[in-house]
UniProtKB/Swiss-Prot annotation:
It comes from Methylobacillus flagellatus (strain ATCC 51484 / DSM 6875 / VKM B-1610 / KT). One of its GO terms (cellular component) is plasma membrane. It comes from the Bacteria. This is Methylamine utilization protein MauE. The chain crosses the membrane at residues 8-28, 49-69, 77-97, 118-138, 152-172.
């Protein structure tokens, strides 16, 4: 197991994965700012005067973290900021799940339908992403030790993990049953 912890390719893969996840989350928020502001408001955690500034700032921080994760001198700080974001997301999700407000959109990535729901999966996913981010912050990467082949393999693996992540996110957002879909009842 120590080979995984100390393997620079694994750290690069984790860094790329978190960067892709953050960029994929940020870009739709820039493209649909009013919709994302509604998502932030729907969490009912912020005073109304903070909803708009947070909705504008959050995608910027996500995108800056995604870019900074690719820049070696900024990587550790960006990973710590990303971990902080994921912990805040986990808390916001957990509070709303605890309140029984599972019908709201998590705001992670934009969906083409309004059928998304939140649940403990989203909370645990955010905690797992925080853990991966902390791993990225903790493991030093000596890029001179990474071959071109290993780097390309890490990039391909990170892209595949990100696609699996987004696919799982979409599947979890589907209605619970065919009857829910037929009735249009997705907010149970």
């Amino acid at each position: 197991m120590s080979w995984l912890i100390n393997d620079p390719t694994a750290a690069v893969l984790a860094s790329l994965f978190i960067g892709i996840v953050l960029a994929a989350a940020a870009i739709p928020k820039f493209r649909h700012p009013d919709e994302f502001q509604g998502v932030v408001a729907n969490y009912k955690l912020l005073p109304s005067f903070l909803v708009a500034p947070v909705a504008k700032l959050l995608p910027l921080v996500e995108l800056l973290c995604a870019v900074a994760l690719m820049i070696p001198p900024a990587r550790e700080i960006a990973a710590c900021v990303a971990a902080g974001l994921f912990i805040v997301f986990a808390l916001a999700l957990a509070i709303n799940v605890g309140r029984g407000r599972t019908h709201i959109d998590c705001g992670c990535v934009r969906r083409p339908t309004s059928m998304s729901r939140i649940g403990m999966f989203h909370v645990m996913r955010a905690i797992a992403l925080a853990g991966v981010s902390l791993y990225v912050a903790a493991v030093p990467v000596e890029f001179s030790r990474i071959s071109i082949e290993s780097g390309l393999m890490g990039l391909a693996a990170a892209a595949m993990l990100a696609l699996l992540y987004m696919g799982a996110d979409m599947l979890v957002g589907f209605p619970n049953s065919k009857n829910d879909l037929l009735k249009g009842n997705t907010n149970d």
